[in-house]
Amino acid sequence: MALAQQTRLVRVDSPLGAEVLQLQRMEGREELGRPFAYELELISENPDLPLDGLLGKPASLALELHDGSRRHFHGIVAACSQGSGNGQFASYQVTLRPWLWLLTRTSDCRIFQNQKVPDIIKQVFRDLGFSDFEDALSRSYREWEYCVQYRETSFDFVSRLMEQEGIYYWFRHEQSRHILVLSDAYGAHQSPPNYASVPYYPPTLEQRERDHFYDWHMAREVQSGSLSLNDYDFQRPGARLEVRSNIARSHAAADYPLYDYPGEYVQSQDGEQYARTRIEALQARYERVRLRGRARGLGSGHLFKLSGYPREDQNREYLVVGAEYRVVQELYETGGGGVGAQFESELDCIDAGQAYRPLPTTPLPIVRGPQTAVVVGPKGEEIWTDQYGRVKVHFHWDRHDQSNENSSCWIRVSQAWAGKNWGSMQIPRIGQEVIVSFLEGDPDRPIITGRVYNAEQTVPYELPANATQSGMKSRSSKGGTPANFNEIRMEDKKGAEQLFIHAEKNQDIEVENDETHWVGHDRTKTIDHDETVHVKHDRTETVDNNETITIGVDRTEKVGNNEKISIGANRTEDVGSNETISIGVDRTEKVGSNEKISIGANRTEDVGNDETISIGANRSESVGNNETISIGADRSESVGANETIDIGGNQSTSIGKNESRSVGQGRDTSVGKDDSLDVGKSFTLNAGDSITLVTGAASIRMKKDGSIVISGKNITIDGSGAINVKADKNVVVKGRKILQN
C-alpha cells in the first residue's frame, strides 16, 4: 500500500520527497542553552534510500495541533541509519539537531579583540555561514580586550562565553528553518498562540479534546545563598575588586557562600554582573516543576500559566526551560493491531519571575605549559611597546592574523627585577622569539616569561667555539647594523679571562660615594678626542715608578689655590716651544738638590706681586742669549752663600727708582773692558777704613783718619774757575822747580 501523510498526526518533510518517509516514533529533548535532539524512527517502502541524501541536510516534522494548525520541529540530519525493517516497510533512524550542533564538528585557534561577547558569538556564526539567529538580549555586556578560542570546537567556545555572561538560547521552529534566539531575560520569551493558559486535569478527569497536564511534580534543592568573586588589575594593583551577590531564601542552610578567583574582570561593575549571573544560575535550580501532559504547542523558551491545580500557589506563570516529547503513530502493517497516534510531553519549568542562567558546565581550554611566539609590530618599527613595557606577539597557531600590531593584546613581559621605578628592563624586539606562559593556564591571560634564539635570530657569539663567553649584546635602533651595538661580555676561558664593555656612543658612570679601581698589571687608556676630569675636592695621584705624560699640542693647568709638586729625585721639564706660568699670588719653588733650567730661546717670567727664590746650596743659571727680568714693584734676592753670575754677552740692569745692595763681607767686581757709572744726582761712596782708586801707576788713597794721598807720575790740577787750597796747618810744596804763572 502507498504511504500517505495527509491524515497523520505528524508529517515528515525530508530532502527525499514528501511521501518517501513517514514517522513511526519520535523522542525529542530540548533545554534552554543546549542543542535539541529529535530521535526519529521512520518507515519507507523503499529499502534502498541513499543515506547521504539525508545526512547533513535539513528535515522537519509537522505536528498537528488541536486547532488544526501545525507545530514544526526543524533540524539538520546529524545521523541516520537503516535497520532490518519489519514486514513490508524498511526501517530508518534519523537524529535531527540544530545547525548550532554543527559547531561541534569544527574547531579553531583564534583571537578576538575589543569585542563584546554577543558580537563574538554572532561573528563565529556568520563566519561559519549561519544566519538563522536572532538577538533578543536586553542586558549590557562588557567589551573584552582579548578573547581566545584555543584548541576547542566552535560550539564549546561560544557555549562557555554564553555561560560566563549569563546568555542562553532557545529555538523557534518554522517549516523550512529553525532560528536560534539569544536571550538573557524574561522579555525574550512569549506564549505561543492559544497557550497562554494551560489547565491541569487529574488523570481520572482527563479530557482529550484540549491540551492539558495530568501530572505535576515540584522539587526544591538547597543552593548556595551567595557568591563572591575577586580579581587583580595590574594597572591598579591596590584596587579592591572583590564583589558579592546573594539571593536570600527562607529555608534553613540557605546562606552558604561560594568564593572564586580569578573572576576574569578588572572593573567592579563587571564583577558584580558575573557574580549575579553565577548565583542566578544556581538559584534557577532551587525549584523545578515538572508537568506531564498533552500540551502539543509548548516547548523550551515558551511562557504559559498553569490553571486548575489544587494547590493554588502553583497556578502561576512558568517558563519552560526543558522539554521531552514522545510521539507514536499508528502502524501500517496488516494485522499489526494498529494503535492510534499518541503525543506526550514532559516540561521542566521554573517560575517566570526567576531569572534563568545556564550553569558553567563547558570546560575552559587549558594551555598545558609554555609556548613560544614571535614579537610583532607595525611595519617599519623595530621596537613596539607601551608604557608598561608590554609587547604584542604572533602565536604559531594563529592562522588568521597578519603578524602586525593587531595580532594580540598587549602582553606583559617578565623582567629580572621589577620595583617601583627601579629594576631591569629588556623589551623584546620585533622578530624575536619569546616564551609565553599563561596565568592559570588561561589562553586569555598570556605573560612573557623568557626569550629564545632560533635559526634566524641567532646567538651573538659563534658557538660552540665561544662557549666560555657570556654577556649581553644589544643592537642600535632604528636602522642598526651588526656593527652598531652596546655590549657587556665576559670571557671565562682559563688564562684568557676578560670583561669587555662596549658603548656604541656615550658611556656615563655615576658613583654616589666611593669608587675603587685595582689593576693588577698594565692599564692603557686611549681617548680619541677630548677628556675632562672634574674633581670637586682633593685628588691624590701616586705613581710608584715612572710617569710619562705626553701632550701633543697645548696643555693648560689651573690650580685655584696652592700647588705642591714634590719630586724625590730628578725632574726634567722639556718645553718644545713656549711656556707661560702665571701665578696669581705666591709661589714657592723648593729644590732639595740641583735644578737645571735650559731655555733654547726666550723666557719671560712675569711676577705680579712678590717672588722669593731660596736656594739651599748652589744655583747655576745659564742664559744662552738674552734674559729680561721685569719686576713691577720690589725684588729681594737673598743668597745664603756664594752667587756667581756669568753673562756671556751684555747685561743691562734698569731700575726705575732706588737700588740698594748689601754685601756681608767682601765684594769683587771685575769688568773685562770699560765700566761706566752714570748718576743723575748725588753719588756717595762710603768705606769703613779706606778708599783706593788705582789705575796703572796712579792712585788716590783716602783713609778714615782723613789723610788723602794722590800718587802718580804727572799730576795736573786744572780748574776752569778758582782753585782754593786751605789748610789749618802748613802747606808744603816741594819740586825741582816751583813755577807760578
From Swiss-Prot:
Pfam families per the UniProt record, alphabetical: Gp5_trimer_C (PF22178), Phage_base_V (PF04717), Phage_GPD (PF05954)
Region (Disordered): 614-678
Gene Ontology BP term (one): protein secretion by the type VI secretion system
Subcellular location as annotated: Secreted
Disruption phenotype: Deletion neither impacts secretion of components of the H1-T6SS nor requires H1-T6SS components for its own secretion. However, simultaneous deletion of all three vgrG genes (vgrG1a, vgrG1b and vgrG1c) totally abrogates bacterial killing.
InterPro entries: Gp5/Vgr_OB, Gp5_Vgr_C, T6SS_RhsGE_Vgr_subset, T6SS_Vgr_RhsGE, T6SS_VgrG/RHS, Vgr_OB-fold_dom_sf
Keywords: Secreted
GO cellular component: extracellular region; type VI protein secretion system complex
Compositional bias annotation for Polar residues: 614-629, 649-663
Record's function text: Part of the H1 type VI secretion system (H1-T6SS) specialized secretion system, which delivers several virulence factors in both prokaryotic and eukaryotic cells during infection. Allows the delivery of the Tse7 toxin to target cells where it exerts toxicity through its nuclease domain.
PANTHER family: PROTEIN RHSA-RELATED (PTHR32305:SF15), PTHR32305
Entry similarity comment: Belongs to the VgrG protein family.
Protein's name according to its UniProt entry: Type VI secretion system spike protein VgrG1b
Organism: Pseudomonas aeruginosa (strain ATCC 15692 / DSM 22644 / CIP 104116 / JCM 14847 / LMG 12228 / 1C / PRS 101 / PAO1)
